């Protein structure tokens, strides 16, 4: 019986961890890549400037970019898995994150808030990609659906971590870019483009900025949720979900298999426990 109750507690813990971030982030609507189920169920990629389009919709009080992805690095000789969450600094500094110690983000770069399960100390600095990030705040209970601890960065830092590549890969990509320009008619007519081609990707207007996972929408008090959602739903490049729908997709998708397994174990344990108790009663009587 105690094992059965323990399995029930594990199941409730899975549900709590799965929807924790969705509850805490405080969004009314989630705008994600068209025909996808959101940043937690699958990969979602939308342009960061989509937030400006969302802000222009009547009834919208605010819109902020959101990035979510998982990385694995080595720290002190051990594997360190981190669920990286990018916050739209300065609008979102992580003030809603429950802190045990430290503070929220105050700078646009090189600061992070970490869950205590990551075993990072306040003030500790870790290298992710080509930069070093300082732990300025510690929180507890903020974990992803797989149980990995969350770490909160600004969106720009989260994207820098996600799209970091070795220097040699950058050099080869720029060389290939220059070769393509040299072999094109445009490169022969405008040789100055060769210098632009081997520069940073951010300096090339034709190349888009890094994509974010979602845009979180906050509605004005008294705004008609259905009307706002209907307006956003007419845009062919995105899909809109409510907070409740995001929770349901997490529970029906990522948590559903674990729920079924735990349910099967509970049924088996109850059945076996019933037989044992019945045999004990039969023996005593």
Regions found by a protein language model. Give the residues of each.
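Hydrophobic alpha-helical membrane-associated segments
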Residues: 2-10, 272-277, 281
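Juxtamembrane alpha-helical signal-transduction segment immediately C-terminal to a transmembrane helix
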Residues: 7-10, 14, 18-21, 254-257, ...
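Structural beta->alpha junctions
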Residues: 35-40, 140-142, 216-224
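Hydrophobic secondary-structure segments that place a key small or acidic residue at a functional site
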Residues: 66-69, 78-88, 95-197
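Peri-transmembrane interface segments
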Residues: 216, 224-275, 282-284
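A short beta-strand structural signal in non-transmembrane regions
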Residues: 29, 168-188, 199-235
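Structured catalytic cores of enzymes that bind and process phosphorylated ligands/cofactors
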Residues: 9, 22-24, 87-97, 105-106, ...
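Hydrophobic, regular-secondary-structure patches
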Residues: 2-83, 103, 107-108, 120-122, ...
């Amino acid at each position: 019986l105690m094992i059965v109750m323990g399995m029930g507690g594990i199941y409730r813990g899975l549900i709590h961890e799965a929807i924790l971030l969705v509850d805490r982030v405080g969004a009314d609507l989630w705008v994600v890549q068209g025909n996808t189920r959101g940043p937690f169920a699958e990969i979602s990629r939308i342009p960061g400037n989509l937030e400006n389009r969302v802000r222009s919709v009547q009834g919208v009080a605010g819109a902020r970019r959101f990035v979510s992805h998982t990385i694995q690095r080595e720290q002190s000789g051990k594997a360190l898995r981190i669920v990286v969450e990018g916050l739209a600094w300065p609008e979102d500094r992580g003030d809603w994150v429950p802190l045990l110690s430290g503070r929220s983000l105050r700078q646009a770069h090189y600061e992070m808030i970490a869950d205590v399960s990551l075993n990072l100390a306040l003030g500790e600095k870790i290298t992710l990609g080509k930069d070093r990030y300082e732990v300025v705040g510690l929180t507890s209970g903020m974990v992803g659906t797989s149980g990995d601890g969350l770490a909160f960065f600004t969106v720009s830092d989260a994207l820098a971590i996600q799209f970091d590549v070795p220097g040699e890969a950058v050099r080869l990509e720029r060389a290939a870019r220059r070769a393509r320009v040299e072999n094109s008619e445009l490169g022969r007519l405008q040789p100055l483009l060769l210098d632009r081609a081997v520069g940073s990707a951010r300096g090339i207007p034709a190349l888009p900025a890094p994509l974010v996972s979602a845009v979180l929408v906050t509605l004005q008090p008294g705004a008609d949720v259905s009307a706002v959602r209907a307006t956003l739903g007419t845009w062919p490049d995105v899909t809109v979900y409510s907070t409740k729908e995001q929770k349901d997709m997490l529970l029906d998708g990522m948590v559903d298999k674990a729920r079924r397994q735990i349910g099967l174990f509970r049924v088996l344990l109850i059945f076996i426990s019933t037989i044992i108790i019945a045999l004990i009663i039969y023996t005593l009587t």
